[in-house]
A protein has these predicted regions:
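Extracellular beta-propeller repeat domains
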Residues: 2-264
Length: 264
């Protein structure tokens, strides 16, 4: 298959089971390909059955889009193109909340703000009502690994998840008082933002330059809500070996615990 430069391909996977619990190789078909640099995050299926996602330019310039695509590729449309005064670089996929709106994050804030740390937005599936509901606090300093420090988190790169209480929960890769990332919750209207956990300060670095902390650093994947009333997640760095950890935290923000530290 020829490589499509600066394009997004939505694929359909056909899986066929055979006797003996074996499976044939997935049949992969491109249902639509269109010019869009750096599609990011997961797709989410809306109430109308269509797929919704985000994409951003190759650089941190305005032009990122929120788009909709029919399952068969017959209807692909841009719902909204982010403006310089909105935010830059959508970093995770969208989540469809119980209010029927789509929510997402951006890695940076408004164009031209060098201390920006990202934002959270919402938009209707019809492409109307785009709104920034939260801007993360400005960056005020950096830690020993040159990661940004602020009060509540910076560079959210993972999809949000909605809790049973209707709040949205997420992680920020950096920021917080130690620059190693945070776990947060926010009401859908953006009026109530709470910091649930700030990852610990950097204690040292490994010989290969990995960040060592007591409880993880740089969470980049989404949280998973479990039936035991805990969120589970991972960090890409930190822990005793600097290779990241698996953690959990209760829905109310208590009981943070490292479950596993990945080995060196």
């Amino acid at each position: 298959m020829s490589r499509i430069r600066s394009a997004l391909a939505l694929v359909a996977l056909g899986l066929s089971a055979v006797a003996g619990h074996a499976q044939t190789s997935p049949a992969i078909s491109t249902i639509v390909a269109f010019s869009l640099s750096n599609p990011v995050g997961n797709l989410v299926q809306g109430a109308d059955g269509a797929l919704y996602g985000v994409g951003r330019p190759a650089t941190s310039i305005p032009g990122a889009v929120i788009y909709r695509a029919a399952l068969d590729g017959s209807d692909v449309r841009t719902l909204y193109q982010l403006k310089p005064d909105d935010a830059l670089s959508p970093a995770g996929g969208l989540v469809l909340a119980s209010d029927g709106l789509l929510y997402g994050t951006t890695k940076f804030g408004q164009a031209g703000q060098i201390d920006s740390a990202g934002s959270i937005f919402k938009i209707a599936a019809a492409g109307t009502g785009f709104q920034i509901i939260h801007r993360f606090a400005p960056v005020t300093a950096s830690n020993q690994d040159l990661n940004p420090i602020n009060t509540n988190g910076a560079y959210p790169e993972a999809e949000l998840v909605e809790g049973a209480d209707g709040y949205l929960y997420g992680v920020a890769r950096a920021g917080g008082p130690n620059g190693t990332g945070t776990i947060f919750k926010i009401s859908r209207d953006g009026t109530d933002f709470k910091l649930l956990h700030s990852f610990a300060a950097v204690t040292s670095s490994t010989t290969s330059g990995l960040t060592v902390t007591v409880d993880g650093a740089a969470p980049t994947g989404p949280l998973v809500a479990s039936t035991d009333n805990f969120f589970y997640g991972t960090t890409s760095q930190g822990g005793a070996n600097g290779r990241g950890v698996v953690f959990r935290i209760a829905f109310d923000g208590t009981g943070f615990q490292v479950l596993h530290e990945f080995s060196a």
